Amino acid sequence: MLSASAEEGTYGSLSYDVINAGEIEITGCNMDVASVEIPAEIAGKRVTSIGDNAFRDCTSLTEITIPDSVTSIGDGTFYGCTGLTEITIPDGATSVGFQTFSGCTSLKKITIPDSVTSIENNAFYGCASLTEIVIPDGVTKIYSGAFYKCTSLTEITIPDSVTNIRVGAFCGCTSLKKIVIPDGITSIEGSVFYGCTSLTEITIPDSVTSIWSSAFRGCSSLTEITIPDRVTSIGDSAFYSCTSLTEITIPDSVTNIEGFVFTDTPWLTAKQEENPLVILNGTLIDGTTCTGSVTIPDGVTSIAGGAFDSCTGLTAIAIPKSVTSIGDSAFYRCTSLTEITIPDSVTSMGDYVFDGCTGLTKVTMPDSITSISDYAFRSCTGLTEVTIPDSVTSIGDYAFRDSTGLTKIVIPDSVTSIGDSAFDNCDNLIIYGHTGSFAETYAKEHGIQFAAYTFGDLDNSGKVDSTDIFYTMYYVANVAVGNPGGLTQEQIAAADVDGSDKVDSTDVFYMMYYVALHGVGKDVSWEEVLAK
């Protein structure tokens, strides 16, 4: 950063500042200049740096000579220099900065010295004429979008010194045919090779443990790939639309497979023909060709995102208790699915999980989940009633938006957060909850009708009596031996009189005490009973 007292000057077509006790930084040039030679010294002072955006949008500039005295080239220095065809970065420069050559569409050749250790974000973004580049051995990091849409780049050598290739580094390099990822890389980050449509061969080293979202998406010429044994996770859409991919070697080490990983590949099509339920290492990755009633086999531990995306022929599904997670958009727009029971083994459900399931009329959620995700039941127009389990603490953004048939939702006291527009366009909705609860506050603030349900009144008779005590005792006894309790979620919420988020013998005691006091004419409140 320049000090307030920095001395300014000009040298031919160049402008500069005197910085750092007598060093020169080039700060700009005449916009119509075609050729520039930066001197090593100006007025006896060494030229050591070129400032941020110094030659930005100098579209007439076709050649430039930079002296070895320059050790720092700023961000965006040659951004948009569309006439520049080649450049040599001087020895001593340590990085190719943010957007340094971004938009240099005529740049065909660049020499990067061994002194450079990093290539920053979008450094060569859109350098559409660049055909090859050699990255020197000293480089350790290639940052996000560094070579984004270098559409003429056919080959690139990445040295073993590189340990980090960031998101989208080679995204859209449509002429790139072959690449070897060095041994030091531990993760292939998101969209790194997205849209490399000419890529036919890639070597993934044994050091890699994860492949991120969309890493190879749209690599339409890739025919085979071997995933090394240390990889444990593959992100969503990692190989999406690899339309020539027929052979994939996937080790047992891969235990986390996200959504749409192999969508639109010949490999997946072949698997679907063998069995419409495509299961890989315990993850159900695809069931989009299923019709009618489907039973997921025991042993499946997760349902990947988009597994049944737009599976309009699916009418019913049985999920085993081995399943612990259901991914984003797993049942997105399954318009013929009418009801679903989620087992209590499931602890998480992704965003959009039942979004657009217009035929869904009944959903049973377990006490094992703690949140209703964003867009989870958006546009489920057939749903009329929903009971949120006591375990849930938050309801996400747009969770029930446009579920226009929804007239009743029971929200327990455990819920303390409801996201933006969660119930938008649910015009006939009544929220049921306890007086003084967050649900009541939310309903009033958002102009939604609220109905309070009474503690202890399980049969909605308007009073708490021996019938309610019997129902509660029956529930507690059955649950204690592992049987279904026989109560709805709404009844369970009413039976949990002590607010412990569970129904047990303590609730039975308080109900008996409450009924006994009222039986002898004492009109006590629940607050008074619980205070005893």
At which residue positions do the language-model features occur?
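A recurrent domain-boundary module in secreted/ectodomain proteins
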Residues: T265, F438-T454, V524-K532
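Structured segments of extracytoplasmic/periplasmic soluble domains
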Residues: D57, G80, G103, G195, ...
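Sec-dependent signal peptide cleavage junction
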Residues: M1-G12
